[in-house]
Amino acid sequence: MSDQTPQFGQTPSEAEPDAVALEAGRKLFAGECTFFHGTQRLDQLPPPMGVEIAFAGRSNVGKSTLVNALTGRKTLARASSQPGRTKQLNFFNLADQLVLVDMPGYGYAQAAKDVKEDWQGLMFSYLRGRPNLRRVMLLVDARVEFKASDIAVMELLDKAAVTFQLVVTKADAVKPTPLQRRVADVYAAARAHPAAHPHVFVTSSDTGSGIAELRAALAGLTD
């Protein structure tokens, strides 16, 4: 990446999909999307049924909210203001073309230790062993610097050779100059991890910024 980090609402050339790609993303995510499975146990995972995209991140980073924004549905994935509430893998079938996986949040210190270890163990085991997992979208809050748990997850994904892509959420909550610094830090993290995709998405589920581009990129993974 060059020294010029994209401002909020701007993206480098690889993230500027053409009209065909944008329309493909719009059509895919306008299709029927239904919840079909939730589990806290590896032995109860659904059989692989096509390309899976997992959404991971710290508790309360906005995973469920982003899934809802992508699909244009307010209540498809249950979002909670209470960090650590989502404790299972939730699977959504998008138009029989893509499976979206809303993962439990990690790094919430106030969760009971045994419960925290149980759901983080499930998450890590899923990431390492799911054969049809095409990409992990690793969400980071625009307002919060990287935590040790974020670094640990990126290192685990490197070790497991699971491709992940960083997505900045809640970008509308940060003023342009600090947002630019934050995005620069996230790009630096992407460069430092071999399993990371080089492009970072900067999004706001509230304003919709970056959502169309992310839809287009995810639709491209179904090819």
Curated annotation (Swiss-Prot):
Mg(2+) binds at residues 64, 86. Residues 49-223 form the EngB-type G domain. InterPro entries: G_ENGB_dom (IPR030393), GTP-bd (IPR006073), GTP-bd_ribosome_bio_YsxC (IPR019987), P-loop_NTPase (IPR027417). GTP binds at residues 57-64, 84-88, 102-105, 169-172, 203-205. One of its GO terms (cellular component) is cytosol. The keyword Membrane does not apply. GO terms for molecular function: GTP binding; metal ion binding. Its cofactor is Mg(2+). Keywords: Cell cycle, Cell division, GTP-binding, Magnesium, Metal-binding, Nucleotide-binding, Septation. One of its GO terms (biological process) is division septum assembly. Pfam families: MMR_HSR1. Necessary for normal cell division and for the maintenance of normal septation. Belongs to the TRAFAC class TrmE-Era-EngA-EngB-Septin-like GTPase superfamily. EngB GTPase family. PANTHER family: ENGB-TYPE G DOMAIN-CONTAINING PROTEIN, MSS1/TRME-RELATED GTP-BINDING PROTEIN. This is Probable GTP-binding protein EngB. The lineage of its organism: Bacteria, Pseudomonadati, Pseudomonadota, Alphaproteobacteria, Acetobacterales. The gene is engB.
